[in-house]
UniProtKB/Swiss-Prot annotation:
Main location: membrane
MF-aspect GO terms: sodium:proton antiporter activity
TM region positions: 16-36, 53-73, 83-103, 108-128, 145-165, 169-189, 227-247, 255-275, 287-307, 315-335, 348-368, 379-399
Assigned protein family: Belongs to the major facilitator superfamily. MdfA family.
Segments on the Periplasmic face: 37-52, 104-107, 166-168, 248-254, 308-314, 369-378
Localization of this protein: Cell inner membrane
Native species: Yersinia pestis bv. Antiqua (strain Angola)
Protein name: Multidrug transporter MdfA
Task performed by this protein: Efflux pump driven by the proton motive force. Confers resistance to a broad spectrum of chemically unrelated drugs.
Gene Ontology BP terms: response to antibiotic; xenobiotic detoxification by transmembrane export across the plasma membrane
PANTHER family per record: MAJOR FACILITATOR SUPERFAMILY, MULTIDRUG TRANSPORTER MDFA
Pfam families the UniProt entry points to: MFS_1
Length: 409
């Protein structure tokens, strides 16, 4: 049964309530990763495990974020966005409380995987609903502004985690994540609209396979989805590996480690604010081009400085900050163009985008760990530069294949 929903053309107070509730859950899910990373050294010490488990916590979390996306997009298309999203938020709250019962590093990592499943619902269900609820110019502004709120997590997470671990056990963090998730659940219950276009239709494996096959056969969609993954990989690799690089490698304190996150994620927020200001005045492809220069130059600075001296962590931070500004400027527009590169229902398209990105993140973070173990910060930053160059090549192909109407709007 086809259903229709008229996208909002402006941001009233009522229209904003849903994205604010969604971004609170996104914040909880992200800070559940970023805040625990500086505390992972305490976790591995409690379980008598090696520091090699530190980035594995994030790998498991992102692997969980890939696990069910293939199902949740089509499921929410046919069963409704609201019930699927609410079930995901509730599951996240339960798993955050369940981790308090673990007694080994293996159990901890397994529970991190289950918590990561909450990420599936943000992309495959939540953001699909956002894209369907608002017209393009409004949607890009919302996406950019939501990204700023969500990015408070990696900005404040390392600082808050480093501070909290000195005064309370790491388990306290997961109680906080559960409380944030519960508040988000209450808000989404009240405010989330139902935008599913195929609600009431039968969910079948054959139909799912047909839809995914059609989406993945779209070369422009593939270029955009792969580009989105490689764009964010250096940032996520930094979040995962920076406790080892800065605290274990450079012998910095947890407070100094947290301070060095501020310019990187502050630049990311500035990039998103710049995007919100330019949106509607500049074409989306041009915004992506504006972001490309800072991204590649920043990654080159980070790689070049550490090739000169493996302890040049301040220059590395400066380079990653410039890169972060570029990704803040380019990413939201690329998400929008990629999502609408296919005519298949947006739950399925969003799920496919999420699976491709999460696969790149999961494998890439482990490869970044290997690069660091093999070549210290030199290998790590060369890996990030390779990721940025792959993004650049894919984006060039993506923009070249775009419809004429998009190129000139």
């Amino acid at each position: 049964m086809q259903t229709s929903f008229s996208p909002a053309t402006r941001l009233g107070r009522r229209a904003l309530l849903f994205p604010l509730c969604l971004v609170l859950f996104e914040f909880a899910a992200y800070i559940a990763n970023d805040m625990i990373q500086p505390g992972m050294l305490a976790v591995v010490a409690e379980f008598n495990a090696s520091v090699e488990w530190v980035p594995t916590s994030m790998t498991a979390y992102l692997a969980g974020g890939m696990f069910l996306q293939w199902l949740l997009g089509p499921l929410s298309d046919r069963r409704g966005r609201r019930p699927v999203m609410l079930a995901g938020v509730a599951f996240f709250v339960v798993t955050c409380l369940a981790i308090l019962l673990v007694n080994s590093i293996e159990q901890f990592i397994a529970m991190r995987f289950l918590q990561g499943i909450g990420l599936c619902f943000i992309g495959a269900v939540g953001y699909a609903t956002i894209q369907e609820s608002f017209e393009e110019a409004v949607c890009i502004k919302i996406t950019a502004l939501m990204a700023n709120v969500a990015l408070i997590a990696p900005l404040l997470g390392p600082l808050a985690g480093a501070a909290l671990i000195h005064v309370a056990p790491w388990q306290t963090m997961f109680v906080l994540f559960a409380v944030l998730g519960a508040i988000s659940f209450a808000g989404l219950w009240r405010a989330m609209p139902e935008t599913a276009s195929l609600k009431g239709e039968k969910l079948s494996v054959a139909n799912m396979w047909r839809d995914y096959k059609q989406v993945l056969a779209n070369r422009r969609f593939l270029c955009g989805s792969l580009a989105l993954g490689f764009a964010s990989l250096p940032l996520l690799a930094w979040i995962a590996q920076s406790p080892v690089i800065l605290i274990s490698g450079e012998q910095l304190s947890t407070f100094e480690y947290g301070i060095l996150q501020v310019p990187i994620f502050g630049a990311l927020i500035i990039g998103n604010l710049t995007l919100a200001r330019l949106s509607g005045k500049t074409s989306i492809p041009q915004l992506i081009r504006y972001g490309a220069g800072p991204m590649i130059v920043g990654l080159m600075i980070a790689a070049g400085s550490t090739l000169y001296s493996s302890h040049a962590y301040l220059w590395m931070t400066a380079g990653l900050s410039l890169y972060a500004f570029g990704i803040g400027l380019a990413n939201a527009g690329l998400v929008r163009l990629t999502l609408f590169a296919s005519d298949i229902s947006k739950g399925t398209v969003s799920a496919a985008m999420g699976m491709i990105s999460m696969m790149i993140f999961t494998l890439g973070i482990e490869l970044a760990k290997v690069a660091y173990l093999w070549g210290d910060s030199r290998g790590f930053n060369l890996f990030n530069l390779m990721s940025g160059l792959l993004w650049l090549g894919l984006v060039m192909v993506f923009i070249r294949r775009q419809p004429e109407a998009v190129a000139t709007e």
